Amino acid sequence: MPSVDIDASQWQKLTQSREKQTTVITPLGMMMLEIQGELELPKDFASLARRDSPNEGRFSEQDGETLIRFGSLQIDGERATLFVGKKQRLLGKVTKLDVPMGIMHFNSKDNKVELVDVMKYKVIFKDRPLPIM
């Protein structure tokens, strides 16, 4: 069976200093979001990204990929609120994962795997979005 070594040096650096984070971090660390349904992106998001003003900041570039900021997550204890755009909000609950999950980066060019972070929590959004009035 094929195998590959896992480099945990990046994760060790992250646990020693929170200033060196390479992932989006919450007060509880990196988290998984579980939503019901799908997030629909605009079909012409590439042209929207070119027209995006720095003040809006909905689009950014990382490693040649266009990233879309679709919302704002607020966590208050065990409750979470996800604002999607300016029209909807989701109410959710923060839960601890039974088994922590490792976030890994696979580099197929040199056949290496890097442990980037470990998730211990997830936010579950069970209900339909609520309109923002």
UniProtKB/Swiss-Prot annotation:
Localisation per UniProt entry: Nucleus
Signal peptide start and end residues: none
Keyword terms: Cell cycle, DNA replication, DNA-binding, Nucleus
Predominant place of localization: nucleus
Listed GO CC annotations: Ctf18 RFC-like complex
Molecular function terms from GO: DNA binding
GO biological process: DNA replication; maintenance of DNA trinucleotide repeats; mitotic sister chromatid cohesion; telomere tethering at nuclear periphery
InterPro entries, sorted: Ctf8
Function (record text): Essential for the fidelity of chromosome transmission. Required for the DNA replication block checkpoint. Component of the RFC-like complex CTF18-RFC which is required for efficient establishment of chromosome cohesion during S-phase and may load or unload POL30/PCNA. During a clamp loading circle, the RFC:clamp complex binds to DNA and the recognition of the double-stranded/single-stranded junction stimulates ATP hydrolysis by RFC. The complex presumably provides bipartite ATP sites in which one subunit supplies a catalytic site for hydrolysis of ATP bound to the neighboring subunit.
Similarity comment: Belongs to the CTF8 family.
Subunit structure: Component of the CTF18-RFC complex, which consists of CTF18, CTF8, DSCC1, RFC2, RFC3, RFC4 and RFC5.
Protein's name according to its UniProt entry: Chromosome transmission fidelity protein 8
